[in-house]
């Protein structure tokens, strides 16, 4: 069992500066943000839709905000991505020859939604052109979602070249990580594979909490001191959740004046949102603060 500040080094973390493979635990993480932006330009700009009434084309990648990363741990790949994308489109109504242009927005491309459920909104500048707008909204949206699906395939194949890929032997075992703060312990156990659970609607949970300690010490509570004090991405589940249902949790550690701000983002079932807020606040954050009051800053 691990005490606070002596956690298991197997958590997925952003990067070790010395590149050491801790305890021969084969993990790595790659930033796919810049590569993703190039892929969006390649896949989305140039999309054309056409029918007897008009022709539309996505001609500009106006804005891309967000990040993406690929993590590998013990032969398992985990992907984290969150994007807000804005595209410019133009078109022409064939009968009148009138040209129109507008905007396509994808406000939340992330693990929270499947590609087919990802919101794609379309707008058009003032003027008549309902036929063209309808064309872009139907056929155009379908092609945009198809391109987003191609991006996710690339994220999981092209962007992972050189990383440790799952092997047939490793695929027979799932690693279940359970965080138990009540006893200030961390348990890691392997379990046999079971059938995949049914897909359930999810929601993004955002929380921020201030702790009267340094980034280094707060970070060490979730992992080990020798790892970079910045960000942790991990799969997490409650013991009473259905098998194979996990939440993806991202923890960012931001230094403030005399304190550390912990920014938490978690994708989980919609019906679990309020319970998880209570769980993080009461069973995790408050216990950590209580532990910090008994622990000197220098450890």
UniProtKB/Swiss-Prot annotation:
Keywords of this entry: Chaperone, Stress response
Q: Name one GO cellular component term.
A: cytosol
Q: What is its biological role?
A: Co-chaperone that stimulates HSP90 ATPase activity.
Q: What is the lineage of its organism?
A: Eukaryota, Metazoa, Chordata, Craniata, Vertebrata
Positions the record marks as coiled coil are none
A single GO BP: protein folding
Designated gene of the protein: AHSA2P
**What is the designated name of this protein?**
Putative activator of 90 kDa heat shock protein ATPase homolog 2
What are this entry's molecular-function GO terms? ATPase activator activity; protein-folding chaperone binding
The answer to keyword Cell membrane applying to this record is no
Which species is this UniProt entry from?
Homo sapiens
User: Record's InterPro entries?
Assistant: Aha1 (IPR036338), AHSA1-like_N (IPR015310), ASHA1/2-like_C (IPR013538), START-like_dom_sf (IPR023393)
Spell out the family assignment given in the record's similarity comment: Belongs to the AHA1 family.
């Amino acid at each position: 069992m691990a005490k606070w500040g002596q956690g298991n080094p197997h958590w997925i973390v952003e990067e070790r500066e010395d590149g050491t493979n801790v305890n021969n635990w084969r993990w790595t993480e790659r930033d796919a943000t810049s590569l993703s932006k190039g892929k969006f330009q390649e896949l989305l700009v140039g999309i054309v839709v056409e029918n007897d009434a008009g022709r539309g084309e996505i001609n500009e990648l106006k804005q891309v905000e967000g990040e993406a990363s690929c993590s590998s741990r013990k032969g398992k790949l985990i992907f984290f991505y969150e994007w807000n994308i804005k595209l410019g489109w133009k078109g022409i109504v064939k009968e009148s020859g009138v040209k129109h242009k507008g905007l396509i927005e994808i406000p939340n491309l992330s693990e929270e939604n499947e590609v087919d459920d990802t919101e794609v909104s379309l707008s058009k500048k003032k003027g008549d052109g309902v036929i063209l707008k309808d064309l872009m909204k139907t056929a155009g949206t379908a092609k945009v979602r198809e391109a987003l699906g191609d991006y996710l395939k690339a994220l999981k194949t092209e962007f992972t070249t050189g990383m440790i890929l799952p092997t047939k032997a490793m695929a027979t075992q799932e690693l279940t990580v359970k965080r138990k703060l009540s006893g200030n312990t961390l348990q890691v156990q392997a379990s046999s594979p079971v059938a995949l659970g049914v897909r359930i609607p999810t929601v993004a949970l955002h929380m921020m909490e201030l702790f009267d300690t340094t980034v280094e010490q707060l970070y060490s509570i979730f992992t080990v001191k020798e790892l970079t004090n910045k960000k942790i991405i991990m799969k997490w589940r409650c013991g009473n959740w259905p098998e194979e249902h996990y939440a993806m949790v991202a923890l960012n550690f931001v230094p403030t004046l005399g304190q550390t701000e912990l920014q938490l983002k978690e994708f989980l079932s919609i019906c679990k949102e309020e319970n998880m807020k209570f769980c993080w606040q009461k069973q995790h954050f408050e216990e950590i603060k209580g532990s910090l009051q008994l622990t000197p800053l220098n450890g």
